[in-house]
Amino acid sequence: MSGSRNNRVMVEGVGARVARGPDWKWGKQDGGEGHVGTVRSFESPEEVVVVWDNGTAANYRCSGAYDLRIMDSAPTGIKHDGTMCDTCRQQPIIGIRWKCAECTNYDLCTVCYHGDKHHLRHRFYRITTPGSERVLLESRRKSKKITARGIFAGARVVRGVDWQWEDQDGGNGRRGKVTEIQDWSASSPHSAAYVLWDNGAKNLYRVGFEGMSDLKCVQDAKGGSFYRDHCPVLGEQNGNRNPGGLLIGDLVNIDLELEIVQSLQHGHGGWTDGMFETLTTTGTVCGIDEDHDIVVQYPSGNRWTFNPAVLTKANVVRSGDAAQGAEGGTSPFQVGDLVQICYDIERIKLLQRGHGEWAEAMLPTLGKVGRVQQIYSDNDLKVEVCGTSWTYNPAAVSRVASVGSAISNATGERLSQLLKKLFETQESGDLNEELVKAAANGDVAKVDDLLKRQDVDVNGQCAGHTAMQAASQNGHVDILKLLLKHSVDVEAEDKDGDRAVHHAAFGDEGTVIEVLQRGGADLNARNKRRQTPLHIAVNKGHLQVVKKLLDFSCHPSLQDSEGDTPLHDAISKKRDDILAVLLEAGADVTITNNNGFNALHHAALRGNPSAMRVLLSKLPRPWIVDEKKDDGYTALHLAALNNHVEVAELLVHQGSANLDIQNVNQQTALHLAVERQHTQIVRLLVRAEAKLDIQDKDGDTPLHEALRHHTLSQLRQLQDMQDVGKVDTTTWEPSKNTLIMGLGTQGAEKKSAASIACFLAANGADLAVRNKKGQSPLDLCPDPNLCKTLAKCHKEKSSGQVGSHSPSMINNDSETLEECMVCSDLKRDTLFGPCGHIATCSLCSPRVKKCLLCKEQVQSRTKIEECVVCSDKKAAVLFQPCGHMCACENCASLMKKCVQCRAVVERRVPFVMCCSGKGTEDVADDIAGGNIPALQKDKDNTNVNADVQKLQQQLQDIKEQTMCPVCLDRLKNMIFMCGHGTCQLCGDRMSECPICRKAIERRILLYSMSC
């Protein structure tokens, strides 16, 4: 049977499109995570030949260890007769069949499944080949997607290993562009690529058909996303990879003693104090990871990863047993049995259909233990639980197993086997075990005694760990020093690739880091997830260990297997203190992870304003704020897209982000905010004077987008809007304050595309600009009354009646900024510290705990009095860095020191800016030289100067990176083994690196592109 199955896999697998699998260990042969290749042939039942889209061809394992996953088997021609994809109507389904486990007779093909068709919460069965065992998968909503890359539409290609089409491409080495993925034949979908060559020729070429690869990509393209862990492993018989016979959905217990569990957990997720709940509670298997470890979910909602040897399948009644009981007329339960209610709400809702149904009042009973009161004729159970009684499907409960002699014997036998398994790999008896345990417990005398014995291995392992690693994680410095005297290997790795320094970082042992550093340990060592000790310390939140590692010159910007640097991890963990320390140590903000996000992008995506504030305050080069992802998105695009208002405000005001940068679709941040109807972001960008008439790739302006999203139902809602009008739409006229100052702060207008459109028109958006279809914004407006309103708003703006720069508008703006944000009756007269904002009057300020403008904690409140110099006007200028406001505008311009504290004035902030309005910050150096900036300075000149300044900073940055740090005259063209470099002339004269002072072991010359 096994031989015939292997032959079948070999025949049916040729041509499949594959990606790297769970046991991959071949670096970037494939081009990286997500890159795709084609199964060319099978050398044997254990080996398969794959040609990657980048042209690399090699043998990979498909038995015992599994290097590959099948992303799409449609090119092989495998078809499921009698089936049809219920989305795209493909009939029959060719390739992998995905069958919904929660709907009747609902199937998807691979393209639709990975394209998120049907309900993402529903679980699916994966059926790889007709008649094969179906595998139940986690819902897609809970699963990770990665991007496929390779020969897809947009890729640049040359001829590949199976090319046989003479000079259709114009000759060897000539390039072309893939325009579409097509079918080579009706029975082999997605097995060919249509290419337009640079010489003008175009044709269809094989990419998977019968295992052939006519093309090789020199510049890959994205091919959509796929659920990596849902793809079958090439060559594996059981898609669940279920060690110990455990399947997803099984209920499991832990029947072992705590010490044994902790020993078995080494290298399998470890043990923490929070896991004590698992010793007395039944959990459900919810996943099996790539290392064959079991992920178990508990009634508390926590998920823990276990060594499969720790778990025992619970003695429970499953739905199949219940069904058999029903047919036989007897129930597997008895009155008085103690049962535990299923805690998976989605599952129990499904099971309760036709069995008493589900009620929201049953929610508190999930995961609780109750007693069976009655068994109905259809075997449904009446259970007393949480002081009430409910009817349950017998499949929705599990009987709490009693402790009997048979179970005790089985447990004793199992314990014996586990103990044997735990230590069966130790070659030198029990000495290694004793050494590791003594090191973990800090028993110096016993460790010293064991090390004197000739037959002990100082690097021996117990449960996958050495004595060095155990002592490091537990902070036993004396034992570490003792082990170092006996020439212990400080770089020994455990199953996960973690070294002693990783364990020290995990255990928050800064002193151990010092000892290991003196012992020659590599502080930049990486484990199998490519994590350094710094990654681990940041993820665990160990600030002192982070500082210690950085003090020892640990590299602050190395990337893990996901491409994340410690900066990314600090942002994810919301540790601003660690983030600041990393930035002070020179962490590189510009490094991007595998998804293309640098630290600024990551903070914007996460909506983390405190992290963004730290990043912007310590940004080494201001122009980094406008760095783009590969799709053209800047941090401001991401904040606008996800409606992270505070982050966007920081980027605009503190980061001075360019508001008009366009992504690959030529959309600005304003396009995205209008498209998603994020009114606060729209108001922010327009107030900051973003350009309103930039066109995207379709020629649409933000006003086109606003009117496209406008519907007649939204027009009807506008009739009741407080700030737009209180009569019917024929007399609807938006108030000028609403249109210019914002979109209102409450009511339905916040989500109204129509009010956004009026706001844009009132601020000068062009009503006549046409998109590529020849449509103006008014052509997209279905309501003539709204068209008239838009035209009127635009006309008033053009004539200056509603202009943002008109005197009336400035007065309105000033009045709005001066009124208290709480009561709106009195004027603002209280300065908040330490942020320096003015938001309320003195009567309302005691009630405000956080600043209404920046959300920072208010630590001080100072009422603004009259100018201490002239006593004629109120104080209206905030001095920085002292934070005092004690002088009016005229007097403040003459001061070099604060009259209140005598601190040097570095910057002056006008009253209007403290109220979050617009103004000009005075710089002390300019004032000292007599150059006081004018409030009405031309905006275009300011933008030009800012752009020139950014370019100068970029040029200076490039010079610093490329010039010799010694002579500062010649280009850097010699690199040392430490990673630093100089010019050749300086380098030849040195015996130690001028940067880190390490001895120069070897010199490597660099060559420019012109050499």
Curated annotation (Swiss-Prot):
Residues binding Zn(2+) 1, per UniProt: C85, C88, C109, C112
User: Which residues make up the binding site for Zn(2+) 2?
Assistant: C100, C103, H118, H122
In this chain, the RING-type zinc fingers fall at: 820-855, 867-902, 964-997
* Keywords on record: ANK repeat, Coiled coil, Cytoplasm, Cytoskeleton, Metal-binding, Notch signaling pathway, Repeat, Transferase, Ubl conjugation pathway, Zinc, Zinc-finger
Identify the stretch annotated as signal peptide in this record. Answer: none
Instruction: Report the protein's function.
Output: E3 ubiquitin-protein ligase that mediates ubiquitination of Delta receptors, which act as ligands of Notch proteins. Positively regulates the Delta-mediated Notch signaling by ubiquitinating the intracellular domain of Delta, leading to endocytosis of Delta receptors.
Record field: catalytic activity:
S-ubiquitinyl-[E2 ubiquitin-conjugating enzyme]-L-cysteine + [acceptor protein]-L-lysine = [E2 ubiquitin-conjugating enzyme]-L-cysteine + N(6)-ubiquitinyl-[acceptor protein]-L-lysine
Q: Give the InterPro entries listed for this entry.
A: Ankyrin_rpt, Ankyrin_rpt-contain_sf, MIB1/2_ZZ, Mib_Herc2, Mib_Herc2_sf, SH3_15, Znf_RING, Znf_RING/FYVE/PHD
Keyword Electron transport found: no
* ZZ-type zinc finger locations on the chain: 80-132
Q: Which GO terms describe its cellular component?
A: centriolar satellite; cytoplasm
What Gene Ontology molecular-function terms does this entry list? Answer: ubiquitin protein ligase activity; zinc ion binding
Where does it localize?
Cytoplasm, Cytoskeleton, Microtubule organizing center, Centrosome, Centriolar satellite; Cytoplasm
- Enzyme class (EC, first level): transferase
Q: Name one Pfam family in it.
A: zf-C3HC4_3
Q: Which GO terms describe its biological process?
A: endocytosis; Notch signaling pathway; protein ubiquitination
- The main location class comes to cytoplasm
Residue ranges that the Swiss-Prot or TrEMBL entry lists as coiled coil: 936-963
Query: Which EC number(s) does the record attach to this protein?
Result: 2.3.2.27
What does the record give as its pathway? Protein modification; protein ubiquitination
Query: What is the protein's name according to its record?
Result: E3 ubiquitin-protein ligase mib1
Q: Where are the ANK repeats?
A: 430-460, 463-492, 496-525, 529-558, 562-591, 595-627, 631-661, 665-694, 698-729
Chain ranges of the MIB/HERC2 domain: 6-74, 143-221
Going by the entry's taxonomy, the superkingdom of the source organism is recorded as: Eukaryota
